[in-house]
A protein has these predicted regions:
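Flexible loop/hinge segments at secondary-structure junctions
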Residues: 1-259
Length: 259
């Protein structure tokens, strides 16, 4: 949840409890018939962001092939399928890769004028619309299908889809780290996100089954639980204990907690 979303809830008298339930990695993958991509987070953001800096100004991204960004990358057209703007996976990817991985690290991007306030964030988070990045809808299985049809294309989706299709797909190494269960769980893989649920206090004791719903998270979020089998990366035992306590006590979410 973003601070402005919590502020909106507070203005409307809505009290919430935030409960972390696990982790998910975001991968860029391709067919095993193609070239395994080994790329830095900065170069990946540079390949996909709509605008790049040139002489202190922002221009339309001119790069057509991966190796134009870095000679170590494949001499192939940049063609990446991914989720639309309505997707949480898309929102996390552009924040972690385009904004924090590229704009915040690249010396030319840092030097270029970005405007005030969130104009900087919006510019960095915008994805290309010239065919290098192709929106493929909310269904990740459609992206998987595209990748199996085109070995030179890459796709962006959650780790669970890579895990479920590991017989035909391979995950790119980002900043020298492969997207594996172990690397995501240990926070070594940098393109990952925490997963949360939010409990509205006004629903407690009113919505039938809410208490049981929360208890079921505790029963199923361990390494041996069904959520792990479905692709969610479990929290450490210490974190599970912390959020199990939160389910029992339901502390009110505040701006300080979000920081």
């Amino acid at each position: 949840m973003k601070p402005k979303e919590l502020e909106f809830c507070n203005k409307n008298g809505v009290k919430l409890t935030e409960i972390k339930v696990g982790y998910d990695g975001i991968v860029i993958a391709n067919s095993k018939k193609g070239i395994l991509l080994k790329i830095s987070k900065s170069d990946l953001g540079k390949a996909l962001t709509a605008k790049i800096p040139q002489n202190g100004k922002w221009i339309d991204n001119p790069y057509k092939n991966w190796n134009e960004i870095n000679p170590s990358l494949p001499n192939l057209p940049i063609r990446v399928y991914g989720p639309p703007t309505t997707s949480g996976t898309r929102a996390s990817f552009v924040e972690l890769v385009n904004q924090k991985g590229y704009c915040a690290k690249d010396k030319d991007a840092k030097a270029a004028s970005l405007g005030r306030g969130d104009k900087k964030g919006k510019k960095c988070r915008a994805m290309r619309t010239d065919g290098a990045f192709i929106e493929a809808g909310e269904q990740d299985n459609l992206i998987v299908q595209k990748l199996n049809e085109d070995p030179n294309a890459y796709g962006i989706f959650g780790f669970s889809y890579l895990d479920q299709n590991s017989d035909t797909l391979q995950g790119a190494e980002i900043s020298n780290t492969a997207p594996t269960f172990e690397n995501i769980a240990s926070n070594n893989y940098s393109v990952s996100r925490a997963l949360y649920i939010y409990v509205k206090h006004q629903h407690i004791g009113v919505i039938p089954g809410l208490k049981k719903f929360l208890e079921n998270w505790k029963l199923n979020w361990s390494e041996d639980g069904i959520l792990s089998d479905a692709g969610m990366i479990p929290m450490s035992e210490t974190e599970r204990e912390k959020y199990a306590k939160a389910i029992e006590e339901l502390p009110v979410l505040t701006a300080d907690i979000l920081k």
